[in-house]
Amino acid sequence: MSATKSIVGEALEYVNIGLSHFLALPLAQRISLIIIIPFIYNIVWQLLYSLRKDRPPLVFYWIPWVGSAVVYGMKPYEFFEECQKKYGDIFSFVLLGRVMTVYLGPKGHEFVFNAKLADVSAEAAYAHLTTPVFGKGVIYDCPNSRLMEQKKFVKGALTKEAFKSYVPLIAEEVYKYFRDSKNFRLNERTTGTIDVMVTQPEMTIFTASRSLLGKEMRAKLDTDFAYLYSDLDKGFTPINFVFPNLPLEHYRKRDHAQKAISGTYMSLIKERRKNNDIQDRDLIDSLMKNSTYKDGVKMTDQEIANLLIGVLMGGQHTSAATSAWILLHLAERPDVQQELYEEQMRVLDGGKKELTYDLLQEMPLLNQTIKETLRMHHPLHSLFRKVMKDMHVPNTSYVIPAGYHVLVSPGYTHLRDEYFPNAHQFNIHRWNKDSASSYSVGEEVDYGFGAISKGVSSPYLPFGGGRHRCIGEHFAYCQLGVLMSIFIRTLKWHYPEGKTVPPPDFTSMVTLPTGPAKIIWEKRNPEQKI
């Protein structure tokens, strides 16, 4: 005990001497030291880290806490490519105080997506971002077992029979937008210019709300209610990921919008209960009939309302971005537009047949266009999990400690020539049956929301994998298929003089085209009334 006291006393004496010397310095030198010391500590820490053979190599950085945030945030795929050449498929970097361990390629997909629930957590990685937008008790603000059951509840409304009923509803909304939106007004105009990042988010939310949430909720989007969705949407930004709550105006608007929208859903739910008006019209009816967990606990109306927000907002960004990218790629490929048009005319008998869900399945080129767009533009360039227990990386000496995050990027793999020859070229025919690579579905597993492929080592994973795989894949293909079918049959489009496909904007949470992203459209049949 006396020895310990002696050591502590001696240490305090040195601290006091150092502090005295520091206070004796001129003010300018003291300020300089305060600034320099964190940088020195940061460099020393990195040097000591590099000596550890049980850690993946760390990307060197100069600015404490910030780390590699700027270069990663601006051009993530270029950042991954440079790091891969230097370190291989496994490396770490610092992102705003977090250590992110990246594992690139199909083996990385397997390592992260099929990791044990006890080892990694999506909830711990994302809850601070999603809960203020979606609300309490759903998605990532609940135990994983609850989330798996919530996905099962929602999946009950995403059946083949439901999709058959959605197709005419989605088509009706697209034609209505073509007629009434100031961006088109096709009954008054034969040509015009649009910014796809204005039109596609609107068309996506109109079609999704009409099909999934019913006529009553869709009608509200024609009022000021639409501005609430816009305010809520602005809660999905990188600054919200880093700082979930700040005393800023857009945070206050986000919180107000969440309460107002969930309150509107709750009013509709209560009205249907009161009138015993629960049918099979939409997702709201489906959740009101089937939202009891295995342990007998029922979701509250507030939780159902929050889950409805999560379903609509969760798919809104990704489908809007994908439809925008499709239009942009086709704008410089009139040959592909013509191929798609001929397929439409063939399947729909020259336009005599009404589009149906079954007929959508007979349009391989249309579906390959969606598939190729998702390959080139994965909606999310990075997917995270927080490490909860130390994880050994198979066939290496690396151990990823608890508290770190693991990061996987299927979008980066999608753009590697080793998996997709000429990967940066838009080529819908790479998916032809006689030329497309065949990826085995393999063993299936049920995480609680229905059986899905357990294999996630495929280089093509546009909807993620494992227990957090997106359940909206078939709805996305249905929605995008109807949308693009009508675009192709109704319009032709091209770029303004000197323009081409814009580069991706990686500064948002979803990979969007850099704006403005304008195309010039013209009606195929100027006399046609919509």
UniProtKB/Swiss-Prot annotation:
Localization, UniProt: Endoplasmic reticulum membrane
Reported induction: Expression is increased during growth on glucose, in the presence of heme, and during oxygen limiting growth conditions and, unexpectedly, during anaerobic growth. Two upstream activating sequences, UASl and UASZ, and an upstream repressor element, URS1, plus a second possible or cryptic repressor element, URSP, are present in promoter. HAP1 participates in activation from UASl but not from UAS2, whereas the ROXl repressor represses expressio of ERG11.
Transmembrane segments: 21-41
Lumenal-side positions: 1-20
Coiled coil region boundaries: none
Main localization category: endoplasmic reticulum
Residues bearing the modification Phosphoserine: 458
Membrane-topology annotation of the record: Single-pass membrane protein
Record's keyword annotation contains Metal-binding: yes
Record has tRNA processing as a keyword: no
Quaternary structure and interacting proteins, as annotated: Interacts with ERG28.
Family: Belongs to the cytochrome P450 family.
Further information: It is the main target for antifungal compounds of the triazole family like ketoconazole which inhibits by coordinating the iron atom at the sixth ligand position. Present with 73200 molecules/cell in log phase SD medium.
Protein name as it appears in the record: Lanosterol 14-alpha demethylase CYP51
